[in-house]
Amino acid sequence: MRFGAWYPLSAAGDLSPEGEGVLQLRLATGLVDYPHGKSAMVWYQHARELRTAARALAVRFADKDLVCRHLIDVDAAVDLAAFCAKLREDFERRFGRVPELEP
């Protein structure tokens, strides 16, 4: 499993797949200052309906210059919710807090 290429969040409703998946959002330019470093990453999400979730994020963050990518070559045996939770945990451990736009 790996993440595909980045694309504008505004296009995510057309470019993200239907069905279950995981996506990431990052700043199109620049970095966020986190307690333990800098990163452009601002959001991780698992969704049962990824395209629907991507469309909702595009509306929610329409005022921000963000890009999106989603998992491709997904292994059907992998628990995607657990995979996404691990990404978040790893991010928080490395950078000292959750991604910038997450609650």
Regions found by a protein language model. Give the residues of each.
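Conserved micro-motifs of the catalytic ATP-binding
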Residues: 96
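GIY-YIG nuclease catalytic motif and its immediate N-terminal context
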Residues: 1-57, 74-93, 101-103
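A short hydrophobic beta-strand segment most commonly corresponding to one strand
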Residues: 66-74
